[in-house]
């Protein structure tokens, strides 16, 4: 009988958005336990080796991490399988680069470079609000931060802006129609649009309708919605494509146009 946590992850069973080819080995790096779920995170090793190509092997990644060059959300991380996830800020002091993990329209984590100014904060979705011992109000975010004494106006599903240096809330956005949001799960993963309305289904899942910048409408569950801006002004810089998913025909035309202009 197996006791304790699993220590391995087969390459075939690894999340598809890591984009690992299945023939180069048997195993994939199993993310450590941490603030993001296994299937919704990107281990540091994959980010450094497979995305940025700063290392060729896992050993090289370990050497980079052990020199304490890599910071995630302002904290040095030396664990190569540390699970970085949505909205995390990865900073490499040595090269002066900062990245924010956000989804592209295909539902993968894009290598999205940001300025040093933007790397000072992150947005977090409020998962839970409760009153702890001695009546102290607490707030829990999507990346497992617990913040005491939050603003009483902040409710579940709102988004808060956190200063990474202090861990304090600097601002917040209400979950409301007319606000800009990103979809963080389901078939519409990575799409960005404005919330048009919310259908309440007591005892089931609330459905939120979203309209993107091209006028396409789609719906998803409330749990997959992450508010990223007031009105249609995003509080973070957006990756290429601005979260608008193209149809297959549009993608083909775009590719052909790019080919002709370069050829």
Swiss-Prot record:
Primary gene name: RPS4
Protein name, UniProt field: Small ribosomal subunit protein eS4
Bridged cysteine pairs (disulfide): none
Alphabetic keyword roster: Ribonucleoprotein, Ribosomal protein, RNA-binding, rRNA-binding
Cellular component terms per the entry's GO annotation: cytosolic small ribosomal subunit
Ribonucleoprotein keyword on record: yes
S4 RNA-binding domain ranges (all copies): 42-104
HAMAP family per UniProt: Ribosomal_eS4
Coiled coil: none
GO biological process, one term: translation
Record bears the keyword rRNA-binding: yes
Similarity section: Belongs to the eukaryotic ribosomal protein eS4 family.
Single Gene Ontology MF annotation: RNA binding
């Amino acid at each position: 009988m197996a006791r304790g946590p699993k220590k391995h992850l087969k390459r075939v069973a690894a999340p598809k958005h890591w984009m690992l080819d299945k023939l180069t080995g048997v195993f994939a790096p199993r993310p450590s336990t941490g603030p993001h779920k296994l299937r919704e995170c990107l281990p540091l090793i994959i980010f450094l080796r497979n995305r940025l190509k700063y290392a060729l092997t896992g050993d090289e990644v370990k050497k980079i991490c052990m020199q304490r060059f890599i910071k995630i959300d302002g904290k040095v991380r030396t664990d190569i399988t540390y699970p970085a996830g949505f909205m995390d800020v990865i900073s490499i002091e040595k090269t002066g680069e900062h990245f924010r993990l956000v989804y592209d329209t295909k539902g993968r984590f894009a290598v999205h470079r940001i300025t040093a100014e933007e790397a000072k904060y992150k947005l977090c979705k409020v998962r839970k609000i409760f009153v702890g011992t001695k009546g102290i109000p607490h707030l829990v975010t999507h990346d497992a931060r617990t913040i005491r004494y939050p603003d009483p106006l902040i409710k579940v599903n709102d988004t808060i802006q956190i200063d990474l240096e202090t861990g304090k809330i600097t601002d917040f956005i209400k979950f409301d129609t007319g606000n800009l949001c990103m979809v963080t799960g389901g078939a519409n993963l990575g799409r960005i649009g404005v919330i048009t309305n919310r259908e309440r289904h007591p005892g089931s899942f609330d459905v939120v309708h979203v309209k993107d910048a091209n006028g396409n409408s789609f719906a998803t569950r409330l749990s997959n919605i992450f508010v990223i801006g007031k009105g249609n002004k995003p509080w973070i810089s957006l990756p290429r494509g601005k979260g608008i998913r193209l149809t297959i025909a549009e993608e083909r035309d775009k590719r052909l146009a790019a080919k002709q202009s370069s050829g």
